[in-house]
Amino acid sequence: MRLIKAARVILFGAPGVGKGTQSERLLSRFPQLNTISTGDLLRHNVKNRTPLGIKVESTMKSGGLVADDLMLRLISNELFTRGWLKGQGPPSVMMLASEAITSEHSAYRQPPIDSFVASPFHHDEGMPPRVSDDPAASFILDGFPRTAPQAGNLDKIVPINLVVSIKTPLSVIIKRIAGRWVHEPSGRVYNTSFNAPRVPGRDDITGEPLIQRADDAEDVYRTRFRKFQETSEPVLEHYAKKGVLVEVEGMSSDEISPKLYAEFEKRFVQ
């Protein structure tokens, strides 16, 4: 199905609610839609030992959060690199993008990492970047924002025009995560109840072993769920005030997907 204008989307939901499954289905149904994963951008830099990757590696390994300024610059530079933002770009560009984009720009000289991180993110308020409304500039942003201040700063870079809060009962999610297996290097997620790997315990793409995450244990998950509720509420309120928040409820991914499709078609197809 073809989009007629750019969709700039964030999916919100508790861990295990099925955001990854819904993203994959949306990408399949709407070919112009792309995904921008801040986690993938960071992992790519760490894997390739870029100056940026070296800087954030210890923070990521310890489970800490990368500084907001750096995350905002990652997103901004990715959008400028893809051509989805026009105008005065960020003051410096590190290794930020997917392998294809990185390869294309591999001759670029990287600025010192300290100056990249130390200078706060900003853009010229008098000359805000122009956001492409080309349907090919459609994306789902994954992993950011996590707080209301982050959402406010993201607004200054690119206006998100749809935020979907996906809701499934806690008891259903707990049962679901009991069957969840993960390919840790790529982040691919499987479930023995649905979307099972072709070979039990092995990743479909690489054949490497799958693991069950320690934080999927029920007691740990309940703590994560409460924390998600506390932190997500102000973010959702922010987007509700912007008039772009939609809630979608369902007991399963198959129940949720048609509702998501309908929302996309109403906003970006018709």
Specify the residue positions occupied by each region the protein language model found.
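Glycine-rich phosphate-binding loop of ATP-dependent small-molecule kinases
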Residues: 1-270
